[in-house]
């Protein structure tokens, strides 16, 4: 078993424990599971089938994460990012007026360019050119964005005409539960309780039941919705247009700096990656982007 784990994931029993890895994987899954709800709901706004978008989101996350685990041998989860998804839905489709098929074609082209840049190591070269201060800022920026996303979804902060961002109703519903969850997780983390994040998520979910926030599912097990309504639904009729060029270049730049920012933020805690591993991590992200477009 240890030999198999080492061959697949670079697992070393002297440095790692199976129970710790399982706990970390479960915690990461629960922390990332919101994407399975948020991403399809965003794509539904532009006309995509929500059930098919759910299945596509799930498959893209599975493919990206397995690539990272087996090929790059890194404990990183890959899934559709909220920034590019918001640009996909609200800018390309709603603001620019294009169909989601047009936007999906842009993602496919951007993903292919992403792979080419990774193969030629252009992204590795870009990473070396980034000053240390910008590397730190990228990690902080990603963290602030995720925090803003969570606080907004929980209605702790809301849009305000005067101050842009305002405080929501924090004594009721989702906002109250979010604050309780943050406090529980923070206390457990400060006390260095093993599995603090997982325990915090579970306790917050249970507390949400009497508050009426946590909804119990109608069915505990079911087959995933069909992928066919969105599978390979591309529109190549407007590939050679200025708007497509703008879309591709914008999404490419977002992906490059989002990926570099995330990896650099993670390595600030775990130590620098060897060049070979770093290149493989970039390639995994590029391949996952291309597969996700399909």
Region spans (language model):
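Select transmembrane alpha-helical segments in multipass membrane proteins
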Residues: 18-23, 104, 138, 238-250, ...
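Core transmembrane alpha-helical segments of multi-pass membrane transporters/permeases
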Residues: 21-38, 107, 240-261
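Early transmembrane hairpin of solute transport permeases
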Residues: 23-170
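Short, Lys/Arg-rich, polar N-terminal cytosolic tail immediately upstream
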Residues: 1-17
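Flexible hinge motifs at transmembrane-helix junctions and intramembrane kinks/re-entrant loops
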Residues: 183-226, 252-256
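Alpha-helical transmembrane segments of multipass membrane proteins
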Residues: 62-70, 90-91, 115, 183-187, ...
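Membrane-embedded helical hairpins/re-entrant loop segments and their flanking transmembrane helices
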Residues: 14, 43-59, 63, 249-294
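Helix-loop-helix junctions that connect adjacent transmembrane segments
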Residues: 158-172, 210-253
């Amino acid at each position: 078993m240890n030999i198999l784990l080492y061959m697949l994931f670079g697992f070393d029993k002297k440095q790692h424990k199976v129970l710790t890895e399982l706990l970390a994987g479960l915690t990461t899954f629960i922390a990332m599971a919101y994407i399975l709800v948020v991403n399809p709901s965003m794509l539904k706004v532009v006309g995509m089938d929500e059930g098919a978008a759910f299945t596509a989101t799930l498959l893209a996350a599975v493919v990206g994460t397995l690539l990272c685990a087996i090929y790059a041998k890194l404990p990183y989860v890959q899934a559709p990012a909220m920034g590019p998804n918001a640009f996909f839905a609200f800018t390309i489709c709603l603001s620019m007026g294009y169909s989601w098929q047009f936007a999906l074609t842009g993602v496919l082209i951007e993903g292919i360019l992403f792979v080419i840049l990774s193969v030629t190591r252009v992204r590795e070269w870009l990473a070396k050119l980034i000053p240390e201060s910008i590397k730190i800022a990228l990690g902080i920026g990603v963290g602030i964005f995720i925090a803003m996303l969570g606080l907004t979804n929980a209605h702790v902060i809301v849009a305000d005409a005067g101050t842009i961002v305002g405080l929501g109703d924090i004594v009721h519903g989702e906002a109250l539960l979010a604050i309780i969850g943050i406090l529980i997780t923070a206390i457990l983390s400060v006390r260095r309780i093993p599995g603090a994040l997982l325990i915090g998520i579970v306790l917050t979910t249970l507390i949400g039941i009497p508050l009426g926030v946590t909804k119990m599912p109608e069915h505990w097990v079911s087959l995933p919705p069909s992928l066919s309504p969105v599978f390979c639904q591309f529109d190549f009729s407007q590939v050679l247009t200025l708007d497509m060029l703008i879309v591709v270049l914008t999404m490419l730049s977002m992906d490059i700096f989002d990926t570099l920012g995330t990896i650099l933020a993670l390595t600030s805690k775990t130590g620098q990656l060897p060049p070979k591993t770093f290149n493989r991590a970039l390639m995994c992200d590029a391949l996952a982007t291309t597969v996700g477009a399909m």
